[in-house]
Amino acid sequence: MREEIRKKLFNISNDESDNIKNSRKVTKVSREAYAKSNSEIMIKSEYFLKNRKVYISKHSRFADFPAHSHNFLEMNYMLSGSVTQTIDGNTEILHTGDILLMSKSTVHFVNAPGSADLLINLMFPVENIDFESLETIMSKNSY
């Protein structure tokens, strides 16, 4: 990976800085980003995707991300380090190079990534996916 990209990804974002400064245990999620039903948080596709075919971001570090689901597909790529996630009640540890693909409505919780951990999120609207091809990729260990 190009060194300037790596440096940029490891830079501490404003959100990460707030997580550290305020000793946050849970990442702050904008109220516009989700709908709440009972105690469940559903991340809105419009907040991230905004009519895009894919949305890519670095997952915020230094605080847990609360349990949530969404109506789009999410792929996590562990670029560096490791992170523990609870996915539909199952605990999984992602290590450098691991990819996790989650279907819509999958409930997952991300434990706080540390300074050496880089988790990349890719989000896709469901209508952009060829499900026949996806079925050949998915295995019994997929979420």
Predicted regions: what they are:
Residues G89-K104, L118:
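Short acidic-glycine-tyrosine-enriched beta hairpin
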Residues N19-E40:
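Eukaryotic acidic, serine/proline-rich intrinsically disordered low-complexity regions
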Residues S82-T84, L100, K104-V110, N128-D130:
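Histidine-centered metal-chelating micro-motifs
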